[in-house]
Amino acid sequence: MIEYLNVHGNPNIGVYIYANNKIALVPPTLTEKDKKKIEETLGVEVIETKIADMIINGVMIAGNDNGLLLPRIVKPEELDYLREHIGDKVRLEILEVRQTALGNLIAANNRGALVSPLIDKAILDKIKSVLGVETIYQRHLANIPTVGSMIVVTNRGGVVHPGVSDDEIRILNSVFGVEFTTATVNFGLYFVKAGLVANDHGALVGDETTGPELMRIQQALRLRG
């Protein structure tokens, strides 16, 4: 299933929403209608939260079905709230690195993870352990270090910024164990994560996404209509 969505009129829904196959972390300001659409499309429990008192959950959080990586600026009460509502569904871990926009710097499915070269190599083993992945790889894509913003990957397929090379696509296919396709969202936006939230069950795209863009994403992520 794939559906259109905006957040307060903004088509860049991936900035605000983090999702895996178990939960979706959304701003507390979403309407009940939008929360229901997220729940039904992705087949997950919707949990309202902020990170560091900001509603940009998709930018601040990285993870997969095994673990969530949270920035060092998460507030203690926010962490307590997440632990209470997530329980033992997913491991929660604060990543003690200078960078805080972890969702823009790390992409993961349940098989592999790609990490920005901006993140200290010394922390890679911890990331691999929290996410429980077989493969972790650190590099830029198309000479851009914010690799998490360029990728949306599930356990079924992946989409990536059109500026990447064929060699880089082959690397992504190997790291994540799925096939990648270049794609855009929201009428030509290359940084696909900004306008796309997806898991193995479904996807939500920003409401400025064109029909051809939607079809390409749907095929790449191997989703039903």
UniProtKB/Swiss-Prot annotation:
Alphabetical GO biological process terms: cytosolic ribosome assembly
Pfam family, one: eIF-6
A molecular-function term among this protein's GO annotations: translation initiation factor activity
Keywords of this entry: Initiation factor, Protein biosynthesis
Transmembrane segments: none
Chain's role: Binds to the 50S ribosomal subunit and prevents its association with the 30S ribosomal subunit to form the 70S initiation complex.
PANTHER family in UniProt: TRANSLATION INITIATION FACTOR 6 (PTHR10784)
Family the entry assigns: Belongs to the eIF-6 family.
Record's protein name: Translation initiation factor 6
Gene: eif6
